[in-house]
A protein has these predicted regions:
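Small/aliphatic-rich secondary-structure junction motif
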Residues: 1-57, 158-206, 229, 233, ...
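A short acidic, glycine-rich active-site loop
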Residues: 56-72, 207-216
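Structural beta-alpha unit
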Residues: 1, 41-44, 60-64, 76-114, ...
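General small-molecule cofactor/ligand-binding pocket signal
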Residues: 35-37, 90-94, 144, 189-191, ...
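Active-site phosphate/pyrophosphate- and oxyanion-stabilizing loops and adjacent acidic/basic residues
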Residues: 24, 79, 133, 178, ...
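Structured core of small recognition/catalytic domains
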Residues: 187-258, 273
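Gly/Ser-rich helix-loop-strand patches that form or flank binding pockets
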Residues: 2, 25, 29, 99-153, ...
Length: 299
């Protein structure tokens, strides 16, 4: 099985509905263990024991009655997914800073995948909120960011778009994309978009464009095609333009149901690099889930 242990990081709001559907669906298809994890309250400042509810913003006393109320509300919110899923699942609650608590629990149970979404997607210019951003940066496994309904994911993923800028971080993402495509018998599109914004002021004629494109294809052949190890269902696509625009075009043209990207594009250490702007723009506009991969041990 590709995923044996899935952690669904729920905000407890409607913003997590799409991630919930995918997490429960993947757990059912993969016969995986599933944990629904919700950080229900952020401790208030001062000497009070009250917490600020992460859904309503109200002050609450984090006693047994409050936690039982939260459990009932989560069971109601995800009643359809819970009823449809034949796999047992755990529901875990915590109090603290959401990103810190999610990462702490992830280190404890060692999931293969974290599914999450940004509850403020509809009103935030930046789709990747502080919690998702922090989790994606430090997570010990791939983080699947789901902000729109995935209509093709119920049968798992059949068309996977892997995007590379040839950084070390992209190598980690490639291993995850290849492993996923191999185990699910999916088509893998290895994609690179030449950033035209980095060559402004330069005029390239058609022969130069073709030569540059061929160089990128040769680089893909050396770095990635040579490591397919018998996997034959792969296609190389090289485009020129604004990277996130071209990535979304490739995904749309090939009916992708998963995009795999490195969490960051530069060769910074995993702990120093913030989520890349291209990833953020893809997440904002993608019609399918986006897997952010940070670390080499990602499966």
């Amino acid at each position: 099985m590709l995923f044996k242990n899935i952690l669904f990081a729920s905000s407890g709001t409607a913003g997590s509905d799409n991630a919930a559907k995918l997490a429960f669906g993947l757990a059912e298809k993969q016969q995986a263990e599933l944990t629904l994890y919700h950080c229900c309250g952020v401790p208030s400042r001062g000497f009070t024991t009250n917490v600020t509810d992460t859904r309503s913003g109200s002050l609450e006393q984090p006693d047994e009655a409050y936690q039982e109320m939260v459990r009932e509300e989560l069971n109601t919110a995800y009643a359809y997914q819970i009823e449809a899923c034949t796999r047992p699942f755990r529901m875990e609650l915590s109090v603290g800073m959401p990103s810190t608590e999610i990462l702490r629990y992830a280190r404890q149970i060692k999931p293969d995948l974290i599914a999450a979404s940004d509850p403020n997607a509809a009103r935030m210019r930046s789709i990747v909120g502080n919690t998702v951003r922090a989790v994606a940066k430090k997570a010990p496994c791939p983080v699947l960011i789901v902000n729109r309904p995935c209509t093709t994911c119920w049968h798992l993923f059949s068309n996977i778009v892997f995007c590379t800028d040839f950084s070390e971080a992209a190598n980690h993402a490639f291993r995850f994309a290849l492993n996923t495509a191999r185990q699910l018998n999916a088509k893998l599109y290895i994609t690179h978009a030449v950033d035209i914004t980095s060559i402004q002021g330069m005029t390239m004629d058609q022969s130069e464009i073709e030569r540059h494109t061929e160089q990128m294809r040769e680089k893909i052949d050396k770095l990635y095609l040579s490591k397919l190890d018998g996997f034959a269902n792969a296609e190389v696509i090289v485009r020129e333009g604004i990277p996130y625009v071209e990535i979304l075009k490739v995904a749309r043209e090939n009916e992708a149901d998963l995009i795999v990207m490195a969490h960051h594009s530069s060769d910074l250490s995993d702990d120093d690099a913030d989520i890349g702007s291209t990833v953020e723009q893809v997440v904002l506009r993608s019609a399918c889930p986006v897997a952010s991969v940070t670390r080499p041990e990602a499966r």
